[in-house]
Amino acid sequence: MNKKQLILLCMLAAGGSIQAQQWPDAPAEARPGTRWWWLGSAVDEKNLTYNLEEYARAGMGAVEITPIYGVQGNDANDIQFLSPRWMEVLKHTQAEGKRTGIEIDMNTGTGWPFGGPEVSIEDAASKAIFQTYDIEGGQEIVQDINVTDKKQQPYSVLSRVMAYDENGRCINLTSHVRKDKLEWKAPAGKWKVIALYNSKTRQKVKRAAPGGEGYVMNHLSKTAVKNYLSRFDRAFKSSKTSYPHTFFNDSYEVYQADWTEDFLDQFARRRGYKLEEHFPEFLDESRPEVSRRIVSDYRETISDLLLENFTRQWTDWAHKNGSITRNQAHGSPANLIDVYAAVDIPECEGFGLSQFHIKGLRQDSLTKKNDSDLSMLKYASSAAHIAGKPYTSTETFTWLTEHFRTSLSQCKPDMDLMFVSGINHMFFHGTPYSPKEAEWPGWLFYASINMNPTNSIWHDAPSFFDYITRCQSFLQMGKPDNDFLIYLPVYDMWDEQPGRLLLFLCAQSVHWRVKFSSNKSEI
């Protein structure tokens, strides 16, 4: 072999080595995803293709369709959610997603929380109304028993009427009520009569899209959740549309929903005693020991019902139809670890700018304060690690800054915060679908940065997306390795926190996790 041949052979070998070291094609899960707002669902095939091609060119790997309210003046082009036409454009989206290599996910509803036009008042989110009457015994009692709040009267159903005397005696008087009147010969003594009504919150879906307006469903009712999901089955099966890769559920923002129709029966079966026999202690705001124990049992029962009747039923339904679930459990009145772990992909949520004391990082009057506590973010990844889930996702850049004032240099620290919190599958918040012909700046959603082609940061977005993809590729191949573990003292939280319904809200976590966080810091 002469000298020239040897040099050529070495060059070819080196070239082959370099080629072998090229970064492999990343799967869709390793690339960043985005929440894809369909404003009014006013989409069309041409612009769906245009949008997906732009996202794929920049390096996105998934879109999550979330229909919301429409664009002002564009009502004529709105498409009713789950209508035959809506299913047509979803089919087109799925076909184009397959062609461009983008996974197509969708919200199991419009706006948030789950609800809509087919949620009857019977299946709507429920709340308890307690009314107390002080009665002197030793006489025939005729007492009006009715909800005093006139707005609630049409929705309230009497569940129990219980009487308690000073010696702890308890009598069930429910059968003594006829036509809103209690007729009872009260034994001697002072009696406290407590009436319980199963009523309704009357909460409507927030930011609902056309065809998605209506009551929020009762997440604690197995029947209500089943009825809600049946609407999707009818739409997908009648249109012969494939179910999406993933069904998504946003953070739990169901307010005052502290009851469900069969709650007393569920409580007795699970806790071993009847709550109605202890209404005075349950309602005692001074919170002596016995009251704290009863309220803790109440909160555990609420947690069980949400986990079983909503989260697990929703996930089982998705699996039956070939899909998986991605869920934001924060805000739930439940053990967050349990609820996060019950789905395929637990998802947390970031709020505001992560500073990390970076010199020169731009801040101004529109920069949102960071509320992304590390321990709060890690509930999702902790649940994933405990349950052996391969992915933990995040809703990223929520309320970071105003749409067009957000720079990629402000995005990166927030993304890094998610990575150190155990996140390996991030979603932007977010990307509005916008027709190519729409006048700049295109269609917008109020609560977000604007991660789409109309924003000036889109020019450099592919490099940022590539950074995310490389980080997530390694994180998804790795396994969690923690120096120490901390047990979540959920029973202490249920016991110590005031009130009855305890929502584990991110914005209020400073109150319910104070002892947990201080102990963690000491460790």
List the model feature ranges, each with a label:
Residues 1-21:
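Bacterial Sec-dependent N-terminal signal peptides
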Residues 20-62:
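Mature N-terminal segment immediately following signal peptide/propeptide cleavage
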Residues 22-38, 197-200, 208-222, 242-246, ...:
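An acidic-aromatic substrate-binding cleft motif
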Residues 32-33, 49, 62, 82-112, ...:
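Carbohydrate-binding surfaces of carbohydrate-active enzymes
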Residues 37-46, 217-218, 400-407:
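Active-site mouth loops of central-metabolism enzymes
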Residues 68-176, 184, 193-197, 205-206, ...:
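Acidic/aromatic-lined carbohydrate-recognition and catalytic surfaces
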Residues 153-210, 278-305, 381, 385:
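Alpha-amylase-like alpha-glycosidases and glucanotransferases acting on alpha-linked glucans and related
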Residues 189-218, 339-364:
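Aromatic- and acid-rich polysaccharide-binding/catalytic face
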